[in-house]
C-alpha cells in the first residue's frame, strides 16, 4: 500500500488539529516547493530524510526491444533520491507488513 497526498493531509488534520483544507494546502505547498527548487536546478536537502539531486545523463546508444533497431537515447536531466542515514536505519529496523 502506498501513502498518498490525501492520506498525508488527513494525518496532518488529525495530528495538528488544523482544518482539512489547510492540511491539504500545506501538503500541496510542500511538494510545490520541492518541485520549484528542482526546476531551478537546486538540490533539495531534507535533514533526517534524504536528498533529491539532479543528474545530467549524456546521450547514449539504445535499442528498440521490438525491432532490435539501434536508436539514440537523448541526453536528459533526471531526479535522484538518496535516503539519509536516519531514514535508512529506520527502514532497516522496521518489520515488513504482509
Curated annotation (Swiss-Prot):
Gene3D superfamilies: IHF-like DNA-binding proteins
One GO location term (cellular component): cytosol
Oligomeric and partner information: Heterodimer of an alpha and a beta chain.
Function: This protein is one of the two subunits of integration host factor, a specific DNA-binding protein that functions in genetic recombination as well as in transcriptional and translational control.
UniProt KW Nucleotidyltransferase keyword: no
One GO term of the biological process aspect: regulation of DNA-templated transcription
Residue ranges of the region described as Disordered: 52-71
Official protein name in the record: Integration host factor subunit alpha
Amino acid at each position: 500500500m502506498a501513502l498518498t497526498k490525501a492520506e498525508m493531509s488527513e494525518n496532518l488534520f488529525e495530528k495538528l488539529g488544523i482544518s482539512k483544507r489547510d492540511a491539504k494546502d500545506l501538503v500541496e505547498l510542500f511538494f510545490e516547493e520541492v518541485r520549484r527548487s528542482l526546476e531551478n536546478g537546486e538540490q533539495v536537502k531534507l535533514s533526517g530524510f534524504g536528498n533529491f539531486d539532479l543528474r545530467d545523463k549524456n546521450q547514449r546508444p539504445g535499442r528498440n526491444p521490438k525491432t532490435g533497431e539501434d536508436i539514440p537515447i537523448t541526453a536528459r536531466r533526471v531526479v535522484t533520491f538518496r535516503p539519509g542515514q536516519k531514514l535508512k536505519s529506520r527502514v532497516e529496523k522496521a518489520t515488513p507488513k504482509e
